[in-house]
């Protein structure tokens, strides 16, 4: 039996899961209050705090301190291929100085440091958000100094794609898929035979708008906003990443509230949900052109995939391209654990971060 601890640091929470082989024995989301995080100027400063939270929780839950592997959510260091990577010092250095700051950058350092508490324990990351396998034609943008760089939900998209393949008695590596993860960020990717050959930057301004992100904006208007004198660089980035989309239009990023207001007959809320469904559908349609329309399946996943009206609108618009399959929610903890298990059992090769 292989014992695995998965760690997923988020902006205001740390999720942990303990697995015995494929069986979860603990899954816990530890919320962090604003007061707890206030002393830290940057996510990376939270390392020791998060580490102690993880160890304390394991102790409180009476989890034996015996693990074969610790697997962390990968950070936003430099672009890499999909897969499972052994954590090394170069990886820690890259995420520490990464331009894009996110709590997920703590995942590899937490995995490595905690693994040292247990003799023989290994430290991994799997399918981080900066997985970059773009085809050459997908990388080219309108300026040489601004090539397209994907930041997407690689972990969940690839896990759901593998699940779909298993359910249909085939291999992920034999399929052409368009996948869309719909949450606070919305990522779309074209998966050709196990590689995401095109994907958007779902973090800071590419693709559909989301509950809280602007998505793609008119470049000229954005330039005027930046030089209006009203905003600093950080304020503009916060608008793009945290205060755009439905939050800007409707005053809330709570999709349960949005769905309730729409169901109560609020036409404004319905209009913006229709617009969101349309933008997601445009993204799916655009990616289908990579395959010249010959797509095996379209997969919708993420927390917003529970929103029935939105999903049905997307299906109505893109169903002519390929069958649409819906896997609501996300299980990144299971995906992390199973990726680590695949390496420990010899089913998948671990990669070296270089």
For the regions a protein language model found, what residue spans apply to each?
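Short glycine-aspartate micro-motif
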Residues: 2-7, 67-71, 177-181
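Phosphate/pyrophosphate-binding loops at sites that engage ATP/ADP/AMP, CoA/4′-phosphopantetheine
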Residues: 54-69, 167-170, 284-296
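Glycine-rich phosphate-binding loops at beta-strand->alpha-helix junctions
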Residues: 295-314
């Amino acid at each position: 039996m292989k014992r695995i601890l998965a760690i997923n640091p988020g902006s205001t929470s740390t999720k942990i899961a303990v697995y015995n082989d494929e069986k979860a024995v603990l899954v816990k989301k530890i919320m962090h209050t604003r007061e707890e995080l206030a002393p830290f100027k940057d996510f990376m400063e939270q390392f020791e705090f998060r580490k102690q939270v993880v160890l304390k929780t394991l102790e409180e839950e009476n989890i034996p301190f015996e693990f074969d592997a610790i697997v962390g959510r990968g950070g936003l260091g430099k672009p890499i291929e999909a897969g499972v990577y052994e954590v090394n010092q170069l990886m820690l250095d890259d995420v520490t100085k990464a331009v894009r700051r996110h709590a997920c950058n703590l995942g590899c350092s937490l995995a490595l440091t905690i693994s040292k508490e247990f003799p023989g324990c290994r430290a991994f990351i799997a399918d981080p958000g900066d997985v970059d396998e773009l085809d050459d034609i997908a990388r080219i943008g309108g300026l040489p100094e601004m090539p397209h760089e994907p930041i997407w939900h690689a972990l969940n998209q690839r896990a759901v794609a593998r699940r779909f393949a298993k359910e249909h008695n085939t291999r992920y590596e034999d399929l052409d898929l368009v996948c869309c993860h719909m949450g606070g960020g919305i990522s779309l990717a074209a998966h050709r035979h196990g590689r995401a050959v095109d994907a958007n930057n779902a973090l800071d301004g590419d693709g559909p708008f989301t509950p809280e992100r602007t998505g793609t904006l008119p470049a000229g208007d954005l330039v005027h906003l930046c030089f209006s004198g009203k905003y600093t660089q950080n304020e503009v980035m916060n608008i793009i990443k945290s205060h755009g989309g439905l939050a800007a239009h409707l005053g809330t990023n709570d999709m349960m509230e949005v769905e309730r207001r729409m169901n109560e007959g609020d036409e404004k809320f319905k209009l913006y949900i229709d617009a969101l469904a349309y933008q997601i559908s445009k993204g799916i349609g655009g990616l289908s052109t990579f395959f010249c329309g010959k797509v095996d399946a379209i997969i919708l996943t993420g927390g917003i995939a529970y929103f029935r009206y939105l999903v049905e609108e997307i299906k109505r618009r893109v169903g002519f391209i390929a069958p649409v399959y819906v896997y609501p929610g996300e299980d990144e903890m299971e995906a992390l654990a199973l990726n680590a298990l695949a390496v420990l059992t010899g089913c998948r090769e671990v990669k070296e971060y270089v």
